[in-house]
């Protein structure tokens, strides 16, 4: 049980900063404290990332994970699909998007076959993935289809030990009320519970209000009275989970950031995003909530404006590695009883 988990480390979109991020952490030997990493992507792109950041580390290509020997350096599962000389850096393109999908497919298959316990990925580019044939809304939907999920899933935003999940997500603000139902709220609460448990504890879940001043007992909006409050009561009665609310959103994050809660369920996208990113954007990560394996990435994107400059900060990616490793260990302990 003390052995560190084997995690895939996907390079991310070749036109972005992903290969640099992966290389930076390798140069600092960061991974060894948390996992046994298997770098997944084109070997040449990893070497390109090392060149950009001005260093080198012992590394070697493998065709199968049985060939991994971490005493010899970093194993790279070489996908042989990205020539650094052909990459158009700082732009979304199908060539790099195809590699994004191939990296994801490889990570998924390695999880399914038990060869890795989860993976962390450098930033992908959704537009490039769609150019390459992605038909799903996002990589999270792509993962859910690959794992045949029938339970709630969504991206979960996390800063330090605080997570946020959403009752509604990528829809216009004018559509939020119509899409805020008992079903969508229950799914968000369930996702918060599942993701909290994946980190090894029973989470304290707070549910935000939608309207100012928590709706003022129906005088300033009915959602708290008609949907949010009754749904919380039903969930607590049926499951016994530690769920409370609704709380006025303008003050909820004060207590949440003070450590009173582990999960905040927000009613729409920016209600939680603004709070976390304002307080500590570099400390934020994205967890693939509800997936059967630990999967996470940094909160920022491909950062095309920083490509090739070795100037991107690594805080978020470091936290993604740590969190994925923590989730992998918690899952291992749960399975072993």
Question: Regions from the language model: what does each represent?
Answer:
Residues 141-145, 149-151, 171-195:
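Active-site glycine-rich loop that binds ribose-phosphate moieties when present
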Residues 146-162, 289-305:
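Short, flexible loop segments at boundaries between secondary-structure elements
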Residues 1-139, 183-267, 271-284, 291-296, ...:
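Contiguous, glycine/small-aliphatic-enriched amphipathic segments in soluble metabolic enzymes
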